[in-house]
Swiss-Prot record:
Catalyzed chemical reaction(s): a primary alcohol + NADP(+) = an aldehyde + NADPH + H(+)
Organism: Entamoeba histolytica (strain ATCC 30459 / HM-1:IMSS / ABRM)
Family the UniProt entry places it in: Belongs to the iron-containing alcohol dehydrogenase family.
Function, in words: Has NADP-dependent alcohol dehydrogenase activity.
Keywords (A to Z) from UniProt: NADP, Oxidoreductase
InterPro entries (alphabetical): ADH_Fe/GldA, ADH_Fe_C, ADH_Fe_CS, BDH-like
A molecular-function term among this protein's GO annotations: metal ion binding
EC assignment: 1.1.1.2
Pfam families: ADH_Fe_C, Fe-ADH
PANTHER family: ALCOHOL DEHYDROGENASE YQHD
Ranges that cross the membrane: none
Keyword Lipid metabolism: no
Lineage: Eukaryota, Amoebozoa, Evosea, Archamoebae, Mastigamoebida
Protein name per UniProt: NADP-dependent alcohol dehydrogenase 3
């Protein structure tokens, strides 16, 4: 059991804290020749004052709103067309992971020349040559969860064929990301809960299925998980608790800024199955992970026994832990913050199970590559 060779690269200028938008001018974050498109979601930023605050610091040529949760290829195509028409060279995403992912996809899509369908960026799994994005990206984060503000990954859905697939490309690392916790304080509880789960599961998936030894990363991952658990009820019960919220925001950033992957491998099984639950049942990303994560943990209980025991002891403080105890503690914490952990709790049926499981034929997921058709079907029935 040894540490894998690795290269760590993260060029994002991360700017944290109250009043951080002022750093746009102080640090000259916008080039003089910038032709800016500002992207955002359903309009909540216009209700909570974030929109007006951002416009004090940037002057967009054009705005593109209406990007949905679990952003769609269909919506992004419209934005790509507008960006090209306006010769955009700088994109500012104001929102959470969905807005940031869509903005990265828009930046890559502007350079796409391989077919009429930029979704090739996802369909090819990011493994074929993609023209690098030329437009720079800035981020004003309003929802802590995905860590997309400091990585080069994204996930895009295509509704036409119920696909939800990831992509990655170093050219879409944001140039800078601003995180002012005050911009997150108007979030409803369900979005905070989903963010807590998403960030926690990012840690789990870089931890429990991993037998490559990097004790530094291991300790850091355990610390981030403990922090998320420790701050979860505080930040839910008092949205104005600045220390609790900035702690949660930073934990979510670190959970997927790629530093926890140094010298180790990524599992990704809970996310892979969760993406399908979003596509076929319409559940939010965090809602799916609260369901799939305990199921994937149970599915790999024997293979991951050592790390589950360690997680139980180091993260949950269980003396003489067992794999089962760690899994139960994880599910209990999900429930304690108000998450449903069974698909049946959402009133969903089993009618899509066969179709979902077929997606994993020849394309197994998980650290052990054992979530294939049969494995996925077993997990789906277990989490029902």
């Amino acid at each position: 059991m040894t540490m894998l060779n690795f290269t760590y690269y993260n060029p994002v200028r991360l700017i944290y804290g109250k009043g951080s938008l002022d750093e746009i001018e102080k640090q000259h974050l916008i080039p003089e020749d910038a032709r800016i498109m500002m992207t955002y979601g359903g309009g909540s930023i216009k209700k909570n004052g974030v929109y007006e605050e951002v416009l004090k610091h940037i002057k967009p040529i054009v705005e593109f709103g209406g990007i949905e949760p679990n952003p769609s290829h269909e919506t992004c195509i419209k934005a790509i067309k507008i960006a090209k028409e306006n010769k955009i060279n700088f994109l500012v995403a104001v929102g959470g992971g969905s807005i940031i992912d869509a903005t990265k996809y828009i930046a890559l899509g502007m350079e796409h020349t391989y077919s009429d369908d930029p979704y090739d960026i996802c369909l090819k799994g990011g493994k074929f040559k993609v023209n690098p994005a030329q437009a720079k990206i800035g981020v004003v984060l309003t929802i802590p969860a995905t860590g997309s503000e400091t990585n080069c990954w994204g996930v895009i859905s295509r509704h036409a064929d119920k696909l939800k697939l990831p992509f990655n490309n170093e050219s879409v690392f944001p140039t800078w990301s601003i995180v002012d916790p005050c911009f997150t304080m108007s979030l409803p509880d369900n979005q905070i809960r989903n963010g807590l789960v998403d960030s926690f599961v990012h840690c789990i998936e870089q931890y429990i299925g991993n037998y490559h030894l990097n004790p530094v990363v291991e300790a850091e991952t355990e610390g981030v998980m403990r922090t998320i658990i420790g701050v979860s009820h505080k930040t839910l019960e008092n949205h104005q608790d600045y220390q609790a919220r900035i702690t949660f925001c930073y934990a979510a950033t670190v959970a997927l800024n790629m530093s926890l992957l140094c010298g180790v491998t990524l599992c990704g099984g809970a996310h892979a199955v969760g993406h399908e639950l979003t596509s076929y049942y319409g559940l939010a990303h965090g809602e799916t992970l609260a369901i799939t994560t305990p199921g994937v943990m149970r599915f790999n209980k024997e293979k991951n026994a050592k790390k589950l025991i360690q997680m139980g002891e180091q993260v949950f403080g269980i003396k003489n832990s067992t794999p089962e105890a760690a899994i139960e503690a994880t599910e209990k914490w999900f429930k304690s913050i108000g998450m449903k952990t069974r698909l049946s709790e959402w009133g969903k049926g089993k009618e899509e199970f066969e179709t979902i499981a077929r997606k994993f034929e020849g394309n197994p997921a998980g650290a052990h590559k054992d979530i294939d058709y049969k494995g996925c079907l077993q997990i789906l029935n277990d989490i029902y």
